[in-house]
Amino acid sequence: MPVSSGIDHAEQQRLNRALVIDSLRRQGCCSRAELARLTNLKRATITNIIGEFIDLGLVVETEFLSSEGGRRSIGLRINGRRYQVIGVMITRKYYCIVRIGLSGEVYALKCHQIPAEIGVEDLVLSMEHNIHKMIAENPETRIMAIGFAVPGPYLQKEGEVAFITNLEGWDEFPISAKLQEAFDIPVLLSNDANAAAYASYWYDAQNEKNSNLVYIVAGQGIGCGLLSNGRLVQGAMGIAGEIGHTSIDFHGPKCACGNRGCLELYCSLLVLENRIKQRLLQGEASCLTADFTTRDLAEAIRQGDPLALEEYERNCGYLVVGIVNLINQFNPSTIVIGDQLVDLAPELLLRLVREQVRERLRPAIWEGLNIEVDQSEYNPIVMGAAALAAQTILEDPFSY
């Protein structure tokens, strides 16, 4: 809807531009008349704003589009080939770099393994090198911003990761400042689960189904991103949604966060793999060997290997406890579960989670809830990191 009165003219212009470009991004391609209908802005206002975007090279005209009345209109789309952003996802074992247009289309994606012995300083240098390399490979493209998604609680004000379980050297490391020094364009950092949650919202053309959403990242660690009315809920320090560090056993083992019995100590890909390896060393029968890979584990679960299946279902049971706690705390309309635990056996995980969550909820709450798994073509964390960078530019493109 158009911007209301009570703000100065310059701010009203900025907000109207942001409204128009975001509507065009969600539609992919549409006419000036369609933009006027979608935004409730006057046709003259749309014409002026689109004219500015075309002069900037941000928007281009395309082929004629057919309308319901039979009249043809010139199509418009964001010039994603010229204006792009980069997203980076950091995990405990690898990092990925994606290059997307401002409207979300993917142009390049590369992943790099993180050697076990590498320190955080050298890891940052490695990422800088490969990002600069990706930028240099496309001199005709202008990279507008870079978004990074990091595991663990990210302290926004300090620009630091508080800690990452099973990974040393990150505590109080000034990653935001280090990365900002390396690039002369805006650099944005977010928690990985927040990035994934934002991806589920940003890439949804209508933005309606996922406006109140919990996205659970179930991979090498456990975290969640919270969306309320389309906005990330981050808390006072930016660490809201750390489901992995909620206790499911107050007599449980001590966690690196200081708590006891944290969900992440019972449920994650790393925990699953370690439990299976311990049982293999004790001589239990399985089609897996002690040096199994994640792909081997997925195949063992698919084949119904008793050991792999038992431990996977055990992981899912712990995950259910965390999910039910989230439902009772935040009352989301949609819960999306993604990352490596899901990738192992998406249909099985979804069935187990739905069955067990339903048993733990009142019928009225269950009936208003949608639980799904993320099987997107691209990893939602890296895509969310890029989306956050893109949205920053789109909210005020003339400032960059």
Over which residues does each language-model region extend?
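Short, acidic, Ser/Thr-enriched surface-loop or helix-capping motifs
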Residues: 101, 156, 227
